[in-house]
Amino acid sequence: MLNNLLKKVFGSRNDRLIKQYSQNVTAINALEAKIGALSDAELRGKTEEFRQRIGEGADLDMLLPEAFAVVREAGKRVLGMRHFDVQLIGGMVLHDGKIAEMRTGEGKTLMATLPAYLNALAGKGVHLVTVNDYLAKRDAEWMGRIYRFLGISVGVILSQMDHGDKQAAYAADITYGTNNEYGFDYLRDNMVTHPLERVQRVLNFAIVDEVDSILIDEARTPLIISGQAEGNTDVYVRMNALIPKLVRQENEDSPGDFSVDEKAQQVLLSEAGFEHAEKLLVQSGLLPSGTSLYDPANINLVHHLYAGLRAHALFHRDQHYVIQNGEVVIVDEFTGRLMAGRRWSEGLHQAVEAKEGVTIQKENQTLASITFQNYFRMYEKLAGMTGTADTEAYEFQQIYGLETVIIPTHRPMIRVDRMDQVFRTMDEKYQAIIADIKDCQERGQPVLVGTTSIENNELLSSLLTREKLPHQVLNAKQHAREAEIVAQAGRPKMITIATNMAGRGTDIVLGGNPEPEFERIRSDESLSESEKTERIAELQQQWQTLHDEVLEKGGLHIIGTERHESRRVDNQLRGRSGRQGDPGSSRFYLSLEDALLRIFASDRVASIMQRLNMPQGEAIEHPWVTRAIENAQRKVEARNFDIRKQLLEYDDVANDQRKVIYQQRNELLESEDITETTTAMRADMLRNLIALHVPPQSVEEEWDISGLEKALAAEYHLTLPLREWLEKEPDLHEDSLHQRIIEAANALYSGKVEQVGAPIMHQYERAVMLQSLDMHWREHLASLDHLRQGIHLRGYAQKNPKQEYKREAFELFTSMLEEIKAEVSKTLMAVQIRSEQQVEAVAETHHAPVNVQYHHAAFEEALGEEKSPESIGEDIEGREHPQKHQPFVRQGEKIGRNDPCPCGSGKKYKQCHGKLN
């Protein structure tokens, strides 16, 4: 009550921000005539002038009004597009590192040119992040005309791009690319064996398009680079044959072997199911007779059993995946697109392959991973834009520290959003949808029907075909024609069925989009300029007639066939209609058999329908029902937020360790000579070995001198007469013995260095160190995965799983560093180098792996659960040696030796993980 009163008096926080930005808009508009009077050369010269002013100490905020006015004028001259006042406000919101919520069709792509140009002037690079390669390429070419006109270089990074081209793209002032490619390039840069192989610069400023999709939906799925692990695929085939013999329980108390929790997306074996599974495994020869499924030696069988159960009970063909060219291809849950080459982790993909009877490929081992949450938080400044962010504003603020600002529309929004209609059954719902589509088609109104899966998409298509209604289908299988289908979805009588969010980023123009046809005429060399102009004018007139016809019929009508878990995704579907003040309408059709209602709201809605005594085939349309559905969606949104927050809390532990490893790795690559580091490591390891045989503060009678002599000879190739030293020098005590052994080891190593020369030895030291660091880091990632999957069980022992995870992860990390030191020290002491070729051979074996895959692992896998996993895979192309030197720039702040160690131990960095340096 008090909040509402204060808002009325002072306005909301959003209103106050818009008011502040509007003052700057007035200043920009005042410069329009002056900037407009400049010649093209003078306008281009403004870029150099701004750069000089920055060099002299000017702040970007001081340049903002004039820089925005320059970009606006360039847009008018190059593209014939003038930035509206609301786009100027949006540009300022992005420049301030906030999220701009802007309705579909209001010109987000053009708006981004303002902050991108301003921030590119500083010379540190600006990254524009899109959801797919098509949009990255389109926007780089389209908006790149403005940047290039103003003397700003533009690059685009694509998934199959040559290494040298990618370096050049990152070196440009402004770079366009996908979220996946930026993340994978960061991981690849931290797997290189030479500083010149890196592609990225400092992570300065990122503008994320469709920020809700990338930072919320895809935040649940870590980016993973993996390589094939050794293993026999036969076990998947044999396990798959057993799964159909296990019986699914109808409910918790009914007989059966396993239950399926759709809400948590888990499969659980009952006690009877556990015994039945053991018998079947013994009969098949997978489980040795007389042993238990949960014996340590059989733990892998449990992994395979649950993977098989999930593959059969939770993952369905044409919904979660399709079969294409004899391979299981994942369908992206959020966009409906095919994710060619992506693979689910933890054996799930192999289990699905076994279920479908296609060739089973080997499991993967994680080489490097990061979540989008941790990747994008590394940018010095982060901003985003979308048509639907307000429902997730709290999460953006909590996780990323990003404020959401709702930008006013250029023209009032007049779309009519009708109330949901709820039916008892799917059949009744689809009959009502067909009737609505028929009505629109008869009136000449275009319709866009949104479905949640390929299965529903194709079901509706078959129903329309039966009714002899011509239509176009857009799902993952028609991915190549996506932009073309979406562009023409606004033509009169056009019926388009699309999976949710497919085609996002391409506007649906009422009357159809004439631009592709215009482009074809412009590029036709057989036509004269006058013929081109005449044909374009003729087409423009035809389009205007169609456009006016659609406006008269009520604009684009949106039909939702099911509510999504997130209100935001429903709003995105609705947002395809009513762009830039156009008319439009929308309605969702639901049934009690829909997944969301069945799992979260069926009892409440069913009881409402019974109270209202609804007859068969009759729809319910009531605020109570709408409220019940919204409450169900809020429940799911809150649950998903908790999962993402939990994932981040766990991943932060790995992220702190990743920062330490990557910083040390980068320092290794940059160092010409790491002798000081290897000498300190060797001394450390020798002290540990000596302490095992000569305990600290012990008397000489407790010393195991012969054991120490053997250990030094076996592990460090040091043959020392320790007993003779002690007999000849009675004053030789524990500390001086330590010192004598370390000096002897250093002398032996110095002899090796003199033998081959310091430069060759330094090169070898670095190669060995990198090899050991990378190998142990990969093994450590696997250990963290295993730890995380079982950590929730600590709750039964009244322990906090998160605290236990932090503690054990720290112990694993410390143990890994000790193993690296020991391995490097022993290798360097044992090696006999005779030529530079031997060193090069060692370095050659440690080149970046070539047969790797890039994928998203399911976010619940990271927490010991699984849901809607996605993965991406492409072979790394042969890396060419870069033509241009790329200076190393540290990612994030350097950790000082006396700073607290980022691993969370509470010790100083130099006394903890800084010891490796």
Curated annotation (Swiss-Prot):
It is a peripheral membrane protein. GO terms for biological process: intracellular protein transmembrane transport; protein import; protein targeting; protein transport by the Sec complex. Keywords: ATP-binding, Cell inner membrane, Cell membrane, Cytoplasm, Membrane, Metal-binding, Nucleotide-binding, Protein transport, Translocase, Translocation, Transport, Zinc. Residues 866-917 are annotated as: Disordered. SUPFAM superfamilies: Helical scaffold and wing domains of SecA (SSF81886), P-loop containing nucleoside triphosphate hydrolases (SSF52540), Pre-protein crosslinking domain of SecA (SSF81767). It is found in: Cell inner membrane; Cytoplasm. It catalyses: ATP + H2O + cellular proteinSide 1 = ADP + phosphate + cellular proteinSide 2. ATP binds at residues 87, 105-109, 507. It is an enzyme of class 7 (translocase). The keyword NAD does not apply. InterPro entries: Helicase_ATP-bd (IPR014001), Helicase_C-like (IPR001650), P-loop_NTPase (IPR027417), SEC_C_motif (IPR004027), SecA (IPR000185), SecA_CS (IPR020937), SecA_DEAD (IPR011115), SecA_motor_DEAD (IPR014018). Pfam families: P-loop_SecA (PF21090), SEC-C (PF02810), SecA_DEAD (PF07517), SecA_PP_bind (PF01043), SecA_SW (PF07516). Zn(2+) binds at residues 901, 903, 912-913. One of its GO terms (cellular component) is cell envelope Sec protein transport complex. Residues 907-917 have a biased composition (Basic residues). Its cofactor is Zn(2+). GO terms for molecular function: ATP binding; metal ion binding; protein-exporting ATPase activity. Its EC number is 7.4.2.8. Its main location: membrane. May bind 1 zinc ion per subunit. Monomer and homodimer. Part of the essential Sec protein translocation apparatus which comprises SecA, SecYEG and auxiliary proteins SecDF-YajC and YidC. Part of the Sec protein translocase complex. Interacts with the SecYEG preprotein conducting channel. Has a central role in coupling the hydrolysis of ATP to the transfer of proteins into and across the cell membrane, serving both as a receptor for the preprotein-SecB complex and as an ATP-driven molecular motor driving the stepwise translocation of polypeptide chains across the membrane. Belongs to the SecA family. HAMAP family: SecA. NCBIfam families: PRK12904.1 (NF009538), secA (TIGR00963). This is Protein translocase subunit SecA 1. The gene is secA1.
